[in-house]
Amino acid sequence: MYPPGCAKVKCSWHHCLPGLLLQLLLALCFFSYLRMSQEKPKPKPMWVSELGAPSQATEGSSAHLPLRVLLWTWPFNQPVALSRCSELWPGTADCQLTVNRSEYPQADAVLVHHREVSHRPQMQLPPSPRPPGQRWVWFSMESPSNCLKLKDLDGYFNLTMSYRRDSDIFMPYGWLEPWPSQPVETLLNISAKTKLVAWVVSNWNTDSIRVQYYKLLKPHLQVDVYGRFHTPLPHALMAKQLSQYKFYLAFENSLHPDYITEKLWKNALQAWAVPVVLGPSRVNYEQFLPPKAFIHVEDFQSPKDLAQYLLALDKDYASYLNYFRWRETLRPRSFSWALMFCKACWKLQQEPRYQTVPSIASWFQ
């Protein structure tokens, strides 16, 4: 018996076959969808260089609305040229970067440089109440030894930005990236390197580890020291002057993880001098550089042993050249404030999730 108005339809197999095949196909699609939805999504890697460089090619962000990002103070109160992030960081939608504090109520995010708010944090931070959904980004390129009153900032910030690899927004002082094509830089000119070792140091603290090491080194090795308390060297002439040296003492002012500064990336590498480093461990340096791109003081039992090694390299052309082999495939790049702000812009676009950093101090120190 069938409902009124309905009649039983007889269907031979060759008439029903197309319908059965269609149902089977739909069932297969449905179960494939269920299987895919239950699988863990594979992470989509952000393009970085082989040695941890900031991204130069990122996922398209053109669909994102431009964010208004307020720079609360200039770093060290020194204005810098701001760039269009879509040009400086390909794949990033342009943020409305501003230093006009009157736009604070409308800003999607506020970038706060530590140095300018470290003396009286509660009075120098942006005012309360904070606009709903606004994110604050704490940033600093100084080491913990030079960041005061970090505990006073606990609970205020949503993101961190620094040279530390575990920052929410990682911005190293420098990085290596593959050549976009064949290397275009001229070959190393050994004949121009008529001097042995240079060191530029502005803050001369006699109790610091780097000065103590230098005092043990200098009886065994001639080191030309430049800086405020030694031979003056204008910044505009630094690269030209340092390019005359085979080695450069890239000694950091304090020893902290990932704290590898312009002393290596600019002073040494831009001058084609082999960096002799004193800072974090060799293992830490090798997370940024190939093992044969630098000489670490911890590889030697004493400053005297280091001096003897450098003097031997000075006379061994082939061994000295081995410290430049990495340049055949990689080139050094350097940090800039404009690039840092655009990295923040990119991160804020990619990560809309709201979070709070409970304690800057416990993380950074």
UniProtKB/Swiss-Prot annotation:
The pathway is:
Protein modification; protein glycosylation
Transmembrane segments annotated in the record for this chain: 16-34
Localization in the cell: Golgi apparatus, Golgi stack membrane
Top-tier EC class: transferase
Which GO annotations describe the biological process of this protein? Answer: fucosylation; lipid metabolic process; oligosaccharide metabolic process; positive regulation of cell-cell adhesion; protein N-linked glycosylation; protein O-linked glycosylation; regulation of cell migration; regulation of cell population proliferation
Stretches assigned to the Lumenal side: 35-365
PTM field: Glycosylated.
* Alphabetically ordered keywords of this record: Glycoprotein, Glycosyltransferase, Golgi apparatus, Lipid metabolism, Membrane, Signal-anchor, Transferase, Transmembrane, Transmembrane helix
GO CC term, one of those recorded: Golgi cisterna membrane
Q: In which tissues is it expressed?
A: Liver, kidney, lung and brain.
- UniProt-recorded Gene Ontology molecular function terms: 3-galactosyl-N-acetylglucosaminide 4-alpha-L-fucosyltransferase activity; 4-galactosyl-N-acetylglucosaminide 3-alpha-L-fucosyltransferase activity; alpha-(1->3)-fucosyltransferase activity
Catalysis performed (reactions)? a beta-D-galactosyl-(1->3)-N-acetyl-beta-D-glucosaminyl derivative + GDP-beta-L-fucose = a beta-D-galactosyl-(1->3)-[alpha-L-fucosyl-(1->4)]-N-acetyl-beta-D-glucosaminyl derivative + GDP + H(+); an N-acetyl-alpha-neuraminyl-(2->3)-beta-D-galactosyl-(1->4)-N-acetyl-beta-D-glucosaminyl derivative + GDP-beta-L-fucose = an alpha-Neu5Ac-(2->3)-beta-D-Gal-(1->4)-[alpha-L-Fuc-(1->3)]-beta-D-GlcNAc derivative + GDP + H(+); a beta-D-galactosyl-(1->4)-N-acetyl-beta-D-glucosaminyl derivative + GDP-beta-L-fucose = a beta-D-galactosyl-(1->4)-[alpha-L-fucosyl-(1->3)]-N-acetyl-beta-D-glucosaminyl derivative + GDP + H(+); an alpha-Neu5Ac-(2->3)-beta-D-Gal-(1->4)-beta-D-GlcNAc-(1->3)-beta-D-Gal-(1->4)-[alpha-L-Fuc-(1->3)]-beta-D-GlcNAc derivative + GDP-beta-L-fucose = an alpha-Neu5Ac-(2->3)-beta-D-Gal-(1->4)-[alpha-L-Fuc-(1->3)]-beta-D-GlcNAc-(1->3)-beta-D-Gal-(1->4)-[alpha-L-Fuc-(1->3)]-beta-D-GlcNAc derivative + GDP + H(+)
What's the family?
Answer: Belongs to the glycosyltransferase 10 family.
Q: What does this protein do?
A: Catalyzes the transfer of L-fucose, from a guanosine diphosphate-beta-L-fucose, to both the subterminal N-acetyl glucosamine (GlcNAc) of type 1 chain (beta-D-Gal-(1->3)-beta-D-GlcNAc) glycolipids and oligosaccharides via an alpha(1,4) linkage, and the subterminal glucose (Glc) or GlcNAc of type 2 chain (beta-D-Gal-(1->4)-beta-D-GlcNAc) oligosaccharides via an alpha(1,3) linkage, independently of the presence of terminal alpha-L-fucosyl-(1,2) moieties on the terminal galactose of these acceptors and participates in the blood groups Lewis determination and expression of Lewis a (Le(a)), lewis b (Le(b)), Lewis x/SSEA-1 (Le(x)) and lewis y (Le(y)) antigens.
Name of the featured protein: 3-galactosyl-N-acetylglucosaminide 4-alpha-L-fucosyltransferase FUT3
